[in-house]
Amino acid sequence: MFVVGGESLIDLVPVSSEPGAERLALPGGSPYNCAIALAKLGNETGFLCPISTDGYGDLLLGPLAEAGVALLLGERVAAPTTRAIVSFNEKMQASYVFERGAERAFTREGLLAALPERVATLQLGGFVPIEPEDAAAWLAVAEKAVAGGATLTFDINVRPLLVGDEAAYRRQLSRLLDLAHLIKLSDEDHDWLEPGRSIEEHAAALLARPNCELVVVTLGEKGSRAFSRHASASAAIYSPPVFGDTVGAGDSLMAGILTWLAETGALAPARLGALDRAALERTLRFGAVVAGLNCAHKGCKPPRRAEVDAVLAG
């Protein structure tokens, strides 16, 4: 079973580029998107995040149920749903301003109790390392999962506007990365975390951490790269026939990569680090198709497995 932990929220997305344009309320949040994408690709998936009792919380539940994602924290919370106010640049790449709420309404004990006994892979990321108390709770979850034999995967997904104490954030992130077997980051994450350092140097530093065996870096329209302990590879993006926007593209790519690795028996310690160039290329290609099909829509709408297979077969 995949367990995905982290935030869910509502993206308030403008319907046009005009100032003051009406905004659509769309379910989102990086871990939320990844959980749905994993389930739609055919994986048994549980989501570890509180959901509000408000109307936006109802809106979040619909796609989870449709995809078949199990809610691991069953009781909903009174805190309002976290909101992300979305803006787009000329390339339709998204940026966000956040108002946090229900996704933080948890306790360490509650998260640990909700973690299933048998977890094959725990996927964390997004807001998880930002607040010290939250980060400590998620670290305990990660430690429990890894001690039980789970593979830990982590999508860094830095949100600089939410980072009040950069030194504390870096410490909290570092503790989680020390446990992770697979680490994903974007070129924007790289530039914020390691300005002036090459991606190759950054990947090597991550691979030198105690558990890390695979690093994936997304490069926007330039595609993606992967680095194992023995090889590296790159892949181009997949461009859908009709383009919507890039919301959830990285989350969809992550779900695709995890799905491919799990299906090929590589999503496990010692196996990730042994991936050669050809295996990395196939992994990135699968992830790119999942991400590209998501980008055919407005907002995050990851594809079903049959859609991905149809593209790969063509």
What are these model-derived regions, one by one?
Residues 121, 127-205, 212-213, 222-223:
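Conserved beta-alpha-beta core of the PfkB/ribokinase-like small-molecule kinase fold
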Residues 10, 14, 53, 158, ...:
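Short, glycine/acidic-enriched loop or turn micro-motifs at the edges of active sites
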Residues 6-8, 127, 156, 252:
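Active-site metal-binding loops of divalent metal-dependent hydrolases
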Residues 100-109, 162-168, 272-273:
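Short gly/ser/thr-rich secondary-structure transition/capping motifs
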Residues 44-126, 311-314:
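Conserved N-terminal subdomain of the carbohydrate kinase-like
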Residues 1-69:
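Glycine-rich phosphate/adenosyl-contacting loop at the front of the ribokinase-like
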Residues 3, 143-144, 197-314:
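Conserved phosphate-binding/catalytic region of the ribokinase-like
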